[in-house]
């Protein structure tokens, strides 16, 4: 499914978006992991138009570099045209057409950069209908329960499109009309150029309205056609953050449903958020409160959640990830993570490995079958296969000026509360005793013990904390011990 070879597309993204009340340009606000402009350009790129032009104005210095990045991502050229003064949508189209050669003779699709649910099928249907009826212009329309803010479609008694009137210029009776302009058009370029040359700014906004082209072309006797979109969300625009949240929720509902239909169990769609670039394998179960963001990849037969957020994380088949926050990491096949686990960028857990409760890992590789069960920080480390890191262990990776790495071999067993003061290497098959502070390399098969014999300082509390609850408790315990009767010796032990 592609556009005909003579089709150019203009994306209007020059508006300041004042109703967003934001320092971020409106078209760069995000939903489902992409900016609004990115959603629109992805949909258009699927149809491979001959030319794709984005018209920028407000904050073009911030938006243009991102358009360039999107062009690289999409593998195609995207031109940028500049509207240097905010003189209306008609003027924006004139600016966009300046990027086309004067002898360009084809169809031009015009759309907005703030319609994030607009899809390739809707655009393809528009151009197909436009060509089928040989229209000078075909405009997408939809019907809204609350049409406030949209241009109204005016029709003749024969139901032909007569004009589009903007909200600010509409009469009270015209504002009752519920069929609205979706802001997406297909034009014959010659007819468009002719009509644009006759636009007037004699209106409430004192701007050149693209919508006035409809009435001009009709007065010329040209064919003006409308194509109605029943699913109004596909062409809904965003002017404020309420509308952004509403469309984000609707897009998420559609994304979740698509995964469900593909064989993924989503226990509670209302509390599950999945970005559009996320992939999930069959028979995976997603529990409530889960967010799968960015380019996260989940394998098949996994269990994810509840209360889990993964951003750009790759999860292998059959893995379990519970109450975990992770980013830019990988989890191997059959591995188990959570609950209350924090995976920071650069974490790579091997197949059948385990990262348990209250474990934080950063910039570390953990081998196949290795377990870090609980209460441990692993930073800047490489751990081999089938090792076990005891509870409350810490990889001490920062010396005050720089980060250092620790290497732990395979089949290593470390006692609870072991401190690895980097840089150190623990050889294959080595052990550490509980409470050991490892400051030097441990040879393969060795047992590292840093603590000396235990020494008890009698009556320390009584001397250092007299009268304290601890001192009183210890005094009572001592007195009770003194009152214990002495056991008489057994009869057969009497001399």
UniProtKB/Swiss-Prot annotation:
Presence of keyword Transmembrane helix: no
Post-translational modification: Phosphorylated at the C-terminal domain by PknB. The phosphorylation is required for acetyltransferase activity, but does not affect uridyltransferase activity.
Residue span of region Disordered: 457-495
Ranges of Low complexity composition bias in the record: 483-495
Main location per the UniProt record: cytoplasm
UniProt-annotated stretches for the region Pyrophosphorylase: 2-241
Top-level taxon: Bacteria
PTM sites of type N-acetylthreonine: 2
Chain spans, region N-acetyltransferase: 263-495
Cellular compartments per GO CC: cytoplasm; membrane
Cofactor(s) the protein needs: Mg(2+); Co(2+)
Pathways per UniProt: Nucleotide-sugar biosynthesis; UDP-N-acetyl-alpha-D-glucosamine biosynthesis; N-acetyl-alpha-D-glucosamine 1-phosphate from alpha-D-glucosamine 6-phosphate (route II): step 2/2; Nucleotide-sugar biosynthesis; UDP-N-acetyl-alpha-D-glucosamine biosynthesis; UDP-N-acetyl-alpha-D-glucosamine from N-acetyl-alpha-D-glucosamine 1-phosphate: step 1/1; Bacterial outer membrane biogenesis; LPS lipid A biosynthesis
Active site: 374 (proton acceptor)
Residues annotated as binding acetyl-CoA: 391, 397-398, 416, 434
Cofactor notes: Binds 1 Mg(2+) ion per subunit. Can also use Co(2+) ion to a lesser extent.
UniProt-annotated binding residues for Co(2+): 114, 239
SUPFAM superfamilies reported in the protein's UniProt record: Nucleotide-diphospho-sugar transferases, Trimeric LpxA-like enzymes
UniProt xrefs under InterPro entries: Bifunctional_GlmU (IPR005882), GlmU-like (IPR050065), GlmU_C_LbH (IPR038009), Hexapep (IPR001451), MobA-like_NTP_Trfase (IPR025877), Nucleotide-diphossugar_trans (IPR029044), Trimer_LpxA-like_sf (IPR011004)
Subcellular location: Cytoplasm
GO biological process, one term: adhesion of symbiont to host cell
Coiled coil: none
Subunit structure: Homotrimer.
Function: Catalyzes the last two sequential reactions in the de novo biosynthetic pathway for UDP-N-acetylglucosamine (UDP-GlcNAc). The C-terminal domain catalyzes the transfer of acetyl group from acetyl coenzyme A to glucosamine-1-phosphate (GlcN-1-P) to produce N-acetylglucosamine-1-phosphate (GlcNAc-1-P), which is converted into UDP-GlcNAc by the transfer of uridine 5-monophosphate (from uridine 5-triphosphate), a reaction catalyzed by the N-terminal domain.
Family: In the N-terminal section; belongs to the N-acetylglucosamine-1-phosphate uridyltransferase family. In the C-terminal section; belongs to the transferase hexapeptide repeat family.
UniProt name for this protein: Bifunctional protein GlmU
Species this chain originates from: Mycobacterium tuberculosis (strain ATCC 25618 / H37Rv)
The gene coding this protein: glmU
């Amino acid at each position: 499914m592609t556009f005909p070879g003579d089709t150019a597309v203009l994306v209007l993204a020059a508006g300041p978006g004042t109703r967003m009340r934001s320092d971020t340009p409106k078209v760069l606000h995000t939903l489902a992991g992409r900016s609004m402009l990115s959603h629109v350009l992805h949909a258009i790129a699927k149809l491979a138009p001959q030319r794709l032009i984005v018209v920028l104005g407000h904050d073009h210095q911030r938006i243009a570099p991102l358009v360039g990045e999107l062009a690289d991502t999409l593998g195609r050229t995207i031109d940028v045209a500049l509207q240097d003064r905010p003189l209306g949508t008609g003027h924006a189209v004139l600016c966009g057409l300046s990027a086309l050669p004067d002898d360009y003779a084809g169809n031009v699709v015009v759309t907005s950069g703030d319609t994030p649910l607009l899809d390739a099928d809707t655009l393809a249907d528009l151009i197909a209908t436009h060509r089928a009826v040989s229209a000078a212009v075909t405009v997408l329309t939809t019907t809204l329960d609350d049409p406030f803010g949209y241009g109204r479609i005016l029709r003749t008694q024969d139901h032909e499109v007569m004009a589009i009137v903007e909200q600010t210029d509409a009469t009270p009776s015209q504002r009752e009309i519920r069929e609205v302009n979706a802001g997406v058009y297909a034009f014959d370029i010659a007819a468009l150029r002719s009509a644009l040359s006759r636009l007037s700014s004699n209106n409430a906004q004192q701007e050149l309205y693209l919508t006035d082209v409809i009435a001009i072309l009709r007065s010329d006797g040209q064919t003006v056609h409308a194509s109605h979109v029943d699913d109004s969300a596909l062409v809904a625009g965003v002017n404020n953050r309420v509308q952004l949240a509403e469309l984000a929720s609707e897009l998420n509902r559609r994304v979740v449903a698509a995964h469900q239909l593909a064989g993924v169990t989503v226990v509670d769609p209302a509390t599950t958020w999945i970005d559009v670039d996320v992939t999930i394998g069959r028979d995976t179960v997603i529990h409530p409160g889960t967010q799968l963001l960015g380019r996260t990849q989940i394998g098949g037969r996994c269990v994810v959640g509840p209360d889990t957020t993964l951003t750009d994380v790759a999860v292998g088949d059959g893995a379990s990830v519970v109450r975990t926050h992770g980013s830019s990491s990988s989890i191997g096949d059959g591995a188990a993570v959570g609950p209350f686990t924090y995976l920071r960028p650069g974490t790579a857990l091997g197949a059948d490995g385990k990262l348990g409760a209250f474990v934080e890992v950063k910039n570390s590789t953990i081998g196949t079958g290795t377990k870090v069960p609980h209460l441990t920080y692993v930073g800047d480390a490489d751990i081999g296969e089938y090792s076990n890191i005891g509870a409350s262990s810490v990889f001490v990776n920062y010396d005050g000026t720089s980060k250092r790495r620790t290497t732990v071999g395979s089949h290593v067993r470390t006692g609870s509360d072991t401190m690895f003061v980097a840089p150190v290497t623990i050889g294959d098959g080595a052990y550490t005793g509980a409470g050991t502070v490892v400051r030097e390399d441990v040879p393969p098969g060795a047992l590292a013990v840093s603590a000396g014999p235990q020494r008890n300082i009698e009556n320390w509390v009584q001397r250092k904390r007299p009268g304290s609850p601890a001192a009183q408790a210890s005094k009572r315990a001592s007195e009770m011990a003194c009152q214990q009767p002495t056991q008489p010796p057994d009869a057969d032990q009497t001399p």
